[in-house]
A protein has these predicted regions:
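Glycine-centric low-complexity/flexibility signal
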Residues: 1-71, 78, 93-96, 102-212
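Structural recognition of beta-strand segments within beta-rich domains
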Residues: 81, 87-90
């Protein structure tokens, strides 16, 4: 046999999991806090670390089109982010920041989830659940997407809680709910025009303090 002949037999590739200690609260007055909604991680420049939980969701538009998405929920005893904290939110998924055990949630800094502008005719990039804008001469993305070259060769505005500007009623329509109570989903992307791409829709962030 192979074993008796002295020929070594190697096992299959394994995996190594390194578990970092997590904080139970997010309380910071300064430094940089990075929220990565693709990895499901929050990291602070002082080394603090917290993992989120992914939830699979699907929004079905009025025309029957399904839009699957994921929400990342980060839960801590207390969340307090002072004005000196620089918050960087990266990744495609919308996020929910929640407290537990009747913990307080205080936000003194800014979480920017603005949709990106078109950099070079390819359409702006969305973050935190915002849909990408359409490239030059291409419709935007999302349930309330803007049409390409809608008015005077310019791209049509997209929608979410309010209707965007478009003469074609199959575009730029409102969807979900403005208060994000049913679906934590971002805004749609604008349509590309004759000369430029469309801007991306804004992202979605939920702040939830556990009640008494």
């Amino acid at each position: 046999s192979q074993a008796s002949s002295g020929t070594p037999r190697h096992g299959g590739d394994g995996t190594v999991r390194v578990v970092r200690p997590q904080v139970s609260s997010l309380v910071f007055t300064g430094g940089t806090l990075t929220i990565d909604s693709d990895k499901g991680e929050i990291t602070h420049s002082d080394g603090s670390f917290l993992l989120g939980q992914f939830s699979n969701k699907t929004y079905t538009a009025g025309d029957g089109t399904a839009y699957p998405y994921q929400v990342v929920t980060y839960t801590a005893d207390t969340i307090s982010l002072g004005s000196g904290v620089i918050i960087n939110l990266i990744g495609d998924n919308p996020i929910s920041l929640r407290t537990r055990n009747h913990g307080n949630l205080t936000l003194g800094s800014t979480i920017n989830v603005n949709g990106g502008n078109d950099p070079s005719n390819v359409g702006g990039s969305g973050t935190a659940g915002g849909f990408d804008g359409g490239a030059k001469d291409v419709d935007g993305n999302g349930p309330g997407r803007g049409a390409t070259k809608s008015v005077n060769s310019q791209g049509g505005g997209a929608a979410f809680g309010g209707q965007g500007k478009d003469l074609d009623l199959s575009y730029s329509q409102t969807y979900a709910t403005a208060e994000l109570s049913n679906h934590l989903i971002g805004g749609s992307g604008g349509g590309g025009g004759d000369a430029y791409g469309g801007g991306a829709g804004g992202g979605a962030v939920e702040l939830f303090a556990h009640g008494d």
